[in-house]
Amino acid sequence: MGPDQISERRVCRVLEQPRGTQRYRAKVKDDERTIIKRMHALVRRHPRRGYRFVHAMLRDEGFHVNRKRIYRLWKKEGFKVPQKQRKKRSLGVGVNGIVRRRAQHKNDVWCWDFVHDRDESGRPLKWLTIEDEFTRESLALEVERSFKSCDVTEVLTQVMLIRGVPRHIRSDNGPEFIARALQNFLASAGVETLYIEPGAPWQNGYAESFHSRLRDELLASELFADLREAKALSAWWRNEYNHRRPHSSLGYVAPAKFAASLAEPPLRLGAAPLACATAQQATDSVHPTLITAGT
């Protein structure tokens, strides 16, 4: 008798295993196939419910089965409750959102907004940010304890004197941005305002993206001793962002380098900025955190 012809009786005797154990085949209860089939139907109908819910439904349908058995069959069949998905938001589909009113060239659309933080003594710090949506340049990164609408107008005037006047400027409906004096200023400069819908910050997506980087790379890593230090570090970070930091949406080119590669659009000088300050005053009063010419 060859090795492949050893009898089952001899193998079981050598291994000291009962022949009954060797020949055992698991018995499927008569109702198990029916229960599994019904479980599949219930899972398809109620995909967000678990095995306890399925057990309760089966009990209501007249199946005499305990919860532990349903749990075993649930695992055996590989049922899982899918993770709840967040409802997707439409990105900028409002009338003045970033999809319908997308920047087509440099100085076409600017966006601005505020970011808040505190210094180490707990006193508030407030940043005014202005960006060119096409080139992704940070045109201004001003920090103060607070801003009034006249302060916002002053910063914007200085940026316009250096950069020219944009065709549009996008913002939320914050009180500083909807002040009548500021609206009159923008109208006289020939700038169309793009106010996003209330409670829809994603419609100002470029500003939100910039703020995310600002928080991650500066605000979250620095504890500002006072306003003066916040101003100095903001100026340093803005320069790094514009001139050294590769931007993924620009093909990993720094915003200033990308802007320099573009053909210059016609310079638009609105009446209001020129009436607010002379070129000499602008040179003397430009904040260090405003963008410089040629970037």
Where are these regions (language model features)?
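Charged DNA-binding/catalytic regions of mobile-element recombinases
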Residues: 1-295
